[in-house]
C-alpha cells in the first residue's frame, strides 16, 4: 500500500441496477464528500455510468443477481482500493451514512480523526409521511423527512480501514469489532421507504432483473412494491423519540449485544430486530 500520507481518504463502493432511482442522490452526497472520482460502481448496465467521471465501473452485465457473489466481488474491490485509500465504504445505493447530528461534523471530517479498524452504523428505515412530498435530491434526508424506524438489519460494518470480507447484504464482515466501533457515532439513513415515486422506479428495475436464487428474488420484488408500507409500521407503538433518547441507546445496546462471532463465519446474528418505536430525524 502507498504511505498513508499520500493515500486518499475514502473509496466508496456500491452496486447499482441502473443510474436512476437513488443513484443520483447517492452520487451527489458521497461525491460532495469524497469526490466522484473516488466512487466505484458494480452494475449490470455499465454503459449507463460512463459519463459520471467515476473511479471505476465493474460490469456484471448478463449475469443473474447473486447476493453472495456481489458481496465477494465488492469485498475484493474494497480490499484492493486499500492500497490507495485509507478507508473503504461499502454500502447499497439507498444507504446514506452520516455522523450523529450532535457531533456537528460531516462524514469526511469524522473519518479524518477516527482510528478504528471497522465502523458499524446504527441503521434507520426512513419513512415518508402522507404530508411529505417526493424526495428532493438537493436536500439532506433530515431536511425533508421527519421519522424513521430503527432496524438492526441496517447495523452494518460499512466502513473499514483494514482488509475485510462482507456477507451478503453487507450485514456482517470477517473481522471481530473493536469496543469503540459499536459506539453509535454513525447513522445509516436507509431510503427504501423514503419516497413512493422512487420506489416505483426501483420496482421497475427489480422486476426486470433476473436472480440466481428464488428467496432473494421474492424478497427484492416484495420489498420494492410501491403500494406497500413498511411491514413493521403496524407493530409500532407510535411513540416518537429523539435519536439521542435513552430508549434508542437501550435498543442499540440490546441489538449489538446479540451479535455472535465464529471464525468460519465472522460476525452474525440469528434474528434482526425492528424497534417498537419511531425516531424523529428532522431538525
Give the positions of each predicted feature.
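N-proximal low-complexity "stem/linker" segments adjacent to membrane-targeting elements
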Residues: 1-24
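Short, hydrophobic/aromatic alpha-helical segments in well-folded domains
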Residues: 25-29, 76-77, 106
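Short, hydrophobic beta-strand segments that form beta-sheet elements in well-ordered domains
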Residues: 38-44
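Catalytic-site signature of metal-activated, phosphate-bearing donor transferases
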Residues: 70-72, 99-283
